[in-house]
């Protein structure tokens, strides 16, 4: 999902970020709000949507088939969804999900109607018989209704009903935090992905419908058009999408130097933007090549890659990325931020997926860090450091990067899963001090967890394994604690006093200081330590662009050390 940063502030910093030959000559202040950010109250509605109860864990979905008709004039949809699954345990009741404003017309299995009850967004389905473990089964749901409209897509999601400048309907949807059950009946939990899917979308004549995957068939009649899209890879439910509009196909190809396979690039754009898109979308191939080099092969080669011109800024729908940035490059015409960021999600978020929205930094933090890595690849390390400085400005420290689990929480006003998540990786890179090892960790993490749903703890385990060291102290502080570490210090004529604040006793991040032209590595702990100064002023800002921590003068340290 596109990062929520004020464009005016970006422009203000533009010349500093891009043209500077060195790191910024200021120490960026770190904030630790006294009051932590709140989470939503755990209502029954949240519990039913977010938790993997026995009514969900009892079955594993392997295929979804959506057959949906979109009626733009009424902002109305109707259709049938067939969920094919395999039983994990014996059961006779399961839970699927559909927002309560959407009407269920029929619910069947094996051509027999099923009894069901609805509570909030949950639908509890009583099967006609006990389903045995390992048995395959399917249920069919016919439904209709007016889905929720997005207030601020893609962050505050739902359907987007707009018209292009020629007056044609132009429709999209984004539902990462709200869930797929906003518009189609599904097992709406991030820890279960179908192995494949088919999406059939019917729209009024003269309009086209685009979804994920490959276009299998088009049925054109005098009044309606139906488009059949097939997804041949696992896909998380919120990524299943549709776009409706008067689109024109822009075809291209990408030849991988990693796999030596050719991926089809089938972009769908509004006809009056075709010539702009033809030039502008060439940059896609540069980004795919860069990410393949860093993290391995593009994950969805059979399904291709496409940008679809959308009536909102952007969203990382798998193999069908929403694009709404107006064909503008950012940062002195170097790259289109939306394309760069959303394409990164094909590796981070779509290939490697968080099993719970609380671990969304694996999507957004990694994708935001990819932006900085791309800047480094085209402009060098100093530009990379300056880009990281820009991200650091927005860190809020109101909540831990890994949020509270089982509540499906996402707040677009709090950018820390983006920018602090990115800084976790940046700080880890500095702390490991071995770029070859660091990037091997990232690539291994992606390749070992391709098409899997994971938690932050899986990344911690891999870092510990690859480095041969225990980095639990690092991740406990930067992922699971809210506050940033602060280095308290003061100096007398001949002594520097220092210690960590807002950390546990096992936090052992080394830092560098400069005394004249000499660099000294300190190993602070929560206990006060000293270093001889010889009347020279210490510079703590030497690696403030390499590590995330704050500094604070505490003149009481010389007195306090006597009482340790």
Regions found by a protein language model. Give the residues of each.
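Amphipathic alpha-helical substructures
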Residues: 414-496
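N-terminal, polar/Ser/Thr-rich
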Residues: 21-78, 82, 162-168, 472
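Beta-strand-rich binding/interaction modules
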Residues: 103-110, 471-472, 491-545
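Extended, low-hydrophobicity, Ser/Thr/Pro/Gly-biased non-transmembrane segments
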Residues: 36-45, 55, 142-251, 540-549, ...
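Acidic/His/Gly-enriched intrinsically disordered linker/tail segments
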Residues: 364-424, 431, 449
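Zinc-dependent metallopeptidase catalytic helix centered on the HExxH motif
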Residues: 285, 322-385
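A surface-exposed beta-strand-loop module
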Residues: 31-32, 99-162, 533-534
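Hydrophobic helix-coil surface modules that form long, contiguous segments used
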Residues: 79, 175-176, 187-340, 369
